[in-house]
Amino acid sequence: MTNNISHNQKATEKVEAQNNNNITRKRRGAISSEPLGDKPATPLPNIPKTVETQQRLEQALSNNIMFSHLEEEERNVVFLAMVEVLYKAGDIIIKQGDEGDLFYVIDSGICDIYVCQNGGSPTLVMEVFEGGSFGELALIYGSPRAATVIARTDVRLWALNGATYRRILMDQTIKKRKLYEEFLEKVSILRHIDKYERVSLADALEPVNFQDGEVIVRQGDPGDRFYIIVEGKVVVTQETVPGDHSTSHVVSELHPSDYFGEIALLTDRPRAATVTSIGYTKCVELDRQRFNRLCGPIDQMLRRNMETYNQFLNRPPSSPNLTSQKS
């Protein structure tokens, strides 16, 4: 096995130099982040990719635990931040025991992964082909490399460092938090919660997607969660005679920032109407158990403003609580 250390160092330095122009590095192993105030953040790396390359990266990362939870917009930011690195056959890309924070996706070529145990000879444990990846633990942990990776053939890789990965997650988290806080401010039943509680709820909202024609909530069913529309639209229908579909009529149509089902945080009443997705719809949801864990029972919170509490508590069960209530 050839050990072309100088080439390996130059390639690694190329990746780190391009990323470090955009990210302030702290001491090794520390997580760097931008201030959460209004100061503009330093731009992330933005390296255009061909459609074919983007598709290969998408396929490579779709089943990777470090990326599978990201939404499409977040993955696209990751793709743009990845830097091209070239290695010759025989080059050592990663050396077991070394520190490193680079994650790689193979665009072309083959790599071999070796592990030495108890000071013994290196053992080939895996072959990684085009579309494969390695080094993902370096994105979040500062621990030494667990294996050695050697290029069997000339390889073309796309690399991402841990600081960039964490920065992307931080930027997206802050962006979502601000958006969700704005949504929550419009929910009448939550209007009187304080800033800390609103931030906690914004962080607790879970994304959920629905396809065209999919029923999100059904009239008469029990419910324990409420929804805010992030993207797309839904139609709200109600049966004048519950169970008689012929009496169903449209109550309203809801759009991004509208919400429905908020009374589920307060009572166990059956759903008063049916909500159906029109086209693809992206929502965020919050259930009563998660709400109570973060903020305590909502009835106690509403008692801060008895007028609001009585308004929701005394609402007739037949009154749909699924229409938007923008302030």
Curated annotation (Swiss-Prot):
Alphabetized UniProt keyword annotations: cAMP, cAMP-binding, Nucleotide-binding, Phosphoprotein, Repeat
PROSITE patterns given in the database record: CNMP_BINDING_1 (PS00888), CNMP_BINDING_2 (PS00889), CNMP_BINDING_3 (PS50042)
GO biological process: adenylate cyclase-activating G protein-coupled receptor signaling pathway; c-di-GMP signaling; culmination involved in sorocarp development; positive regulation of gene expression; regulation of adenylate cyclase-activating G protein-coupled receptor signaling pathway; regulation of gene expression; regulation of protein kinase A signaling; regulation of sorocarp development
PTM entry text: The pseudophosphorylation site binds to the substrate-binding region of the catalytic chain but is not phosphorylated. The physiological significance of phosphorylations by other kinases is unclear.
InterPro entries: cAMP-dep_PK_reg_su-like (IPR050503), cAMP_dep_PK_reg_su (IPR012198), cNMP-bd_CS (IPR018488), cNMP-bd_dom (IPR000595), cNMP-bd_dom_sf (IPR018490), RmlC-like_jellyroll (IPR014710)
Effect of deleting the gene: AcaA and pkaR double mutant shows no abolition of the ability to sporulate.
Phosphoserine: residues carrying this PTM: 32
Pfam families: cNMP_binding (PF00027)
Residues binding 3',5'-cyclic AMP 1, per UniProt: 66-188
Stretches for region Disordered: 1-47
Region entry Dimerization and phosphorylation, spans: 1-65
GO molecular function, one term: cAMP-dependent protein kinase regulator activity
Quaternary structure, from the entry: In Dictyostelium the holoenzyme is a dimer composed of a regulatory (R) and a catalytic (C) subunit. In the presence of cAMP it dissociates into the active C subunit and an R monomer. In other eukaryotes the holoenzyme is a tetramer composed of 2 regulatory (R) and 2 catalytic (C) subunits. In the presence of cAMP it dissociates into active monomeric C subunits and an R dimer.
Additional notes on this entry: In D.discoideum each R subunit carries only 1 high-affinity cAMP binding site (2 in other eukaryotes).
Family: Belongs to the cAMP-dependent kinase regulatory chain family.
Protein name per UniProt: cAMP-dependent protein kinase regulatory subunit
